[in-house]
Regions:
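Conserved donor-binding/catalytic core segment of Leloir-type glycosyltransferases
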Residues: 10, 169, 205-234, 247
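Nucleotide-activated donor-binding/catalytic signature segment of Leloir-type glycosyltransferases, i.e.
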Residues: 259-277
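Short alpha-helical donor nucleotide-sugar binding micro-motif in glycosyltransferases
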Residues: 276-277, 284-289
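Conserved acidic donor-binding segment of nucleotide-sugar-dependent glycosyltransferases
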Residues: 329, 333-340, 349-355
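N-terminal subdomain of nucleotide-sugar transferases
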Residues: 1-66
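Short hydrophobic beta-strand element within catalytic cores of glycosyltransferases
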Residues: 314-317
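Aromatic "clamp/platform" in nucleotide-sugar-dependent glycosyltransferases that forms part
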Residues: 297
Length: 365
């Protein structure tokens, strides 16, 4: 790096929100924007893996493309995902594709000072191979809920190589503990980045007639919104004198199932599916919310919980690992995973004490 020149970081994510799921890996975009705003020269390389179902269209697909974002550019290259036939061959092809992107990138932007990969396999492994070959320091940040698989069985050789040729970080402390205790891999905590400033507006007055719950989530397996709906059904049956409203923000592959479940449980009059919303729209919804409800079976971090706290909104969450590191009695109620009755009890506890919570402590959590 030349004297007085900005730090140059090249980000390599495993996931990127350019397919049907516009939320998967969205934190990578927030991360790059934050680096750029801090004065770091930042860009991104992404391998867009196409499933074999895309094979008929693949020959005519544009193989190389780019996407301009706030403060950085994402350089993309498509490849076929052949992991169903051979995971080893797929990873080798992935590494070659990343190197092609890297060589083209260096011609345009010069050699980066740091490679920052997100998720150990495949992006972390590919970055570690690049770093060793081209003498570039590598940082890996692990986000995946199934990260232990990268250090076990046939994948272990790739995960261990990546960890030994990088500075290893994870978004939550429980992940670093597992890496250290089970796999003898030193790692530090590097939390996800969120734009909390967007959520620090004033809260709207409470609605004395209703306790308003909100879930902000991609509607995909593992988010377990069906458990939240079951908890709402229990509340309605056991406490008919209490009124709850539940807003679900987001979309995804489980949306139709969740809507069908809400209807079957007779909850259509109190449950609203409002679809995907912008950051400012989510902030407005949270300003009119009494508690955020998270029902996931596992979250490595939990950005919606951080956004809710920034908005002064307490959180009701399952004990889903990541959020437990920053939720406490001043701002949250916890319940067991896949336990609608325990979630019902947590909602009742929060409803009973929400008026006594210190908004300043919630925002500072």
């Amino acid at each position: 790096m030349q004297k007085n020149s900005p730090l140059h970081v090249l980000v390599i994510p495993t996931w990127y929100p350019n397919g049907e799921d516009k939320l998967i890996g969205v934190y990578h975009k927030l991360f790059c924007t934050a680096l750029a705003e801090y004065g770091v020269k930042t860009n991104m390389l992404y391998v867009d893996r196409q499933g074999l179902s895309a094979l008929p269209k693949y020959p005519t697909m544009q193989k190389v493309y780019e996407e301009s974002n706030t403060g950085y550019v994402t350089y993309c290259r498509r490849m076929l995902d052949i992991s169903k036939f051979s995971a080893d061959a797929q990873l080798s092809a992935y590494c070659r594709t990343i190197e092609k992107l890297y060589k083209a990138y260096v011609k345009q932007h010069g050699k980066p000072d740091i490679l920052h990969a997100h998720v150990t396999v495949p992006a972390g492994y590919a970055a570690a191979k690049l770093g060793e070959k081209y003498h570039i320091p590598v940082v890996i940040t692990e986000h995946s809920s199934y990260f232990e698989r990268f250090f076990e069985g046939s994948t272990a050789k790739y995960g261990l190589y990546a960890a030994r040729h990088s500075v290893m970080t994870c978004v939550s402390g429980y992940m670093t503990d597992i890496l250290k205790e089970k796999h003898n891999i030193p790692a530090e905590v590097l939390p996800n980045i969120g734009n909390t400033k967007a959520f620090r507006g004033a809260k709207k007055p409470k609605d004395p007639a209703h306790f308003r719950l909100t879930t902000v989530s991609a509607l995909r397996p593992g988010k377990c919104v069906e458990d939240a709906l079951q908890a709402l059904k229990l509340l309605r049956e056991q406490y008919p004198e209490k009124s709850f409203l539940y807003t679900i923000v987001g979309d995804g592959q489980e949306e139709a199932l969740y809507k069908k479940t809400a209807s079957a449980l007779g909850l259509n009059d109190i449950v609203s599916f409002v679809g995907r919303k912008t950051e400012s729209e989510i902030a407005e919804i949270l300003s009119q919310t009494d508690a955020l409800l998270m029902a996931s079976d596992i979250e490595t971090f939990g950005i919606p919980a951080v956004e809710a706290l920034a908005a002064g909104v307490p959180v009701i969450s399952t004990r889903c690992k990541g959020p437990e590191s920053f939720l406490n009695d001043d701002c949250a109620e916890l319940c067991n995973v896949h336990d609608p009755k325990d979630m019902e009890d947590a909602i009742l506890r929060m409803a009973a004490r929400s008026d006594t919570l210190d908004e300043a402590k919630i925002r500072a959590a």
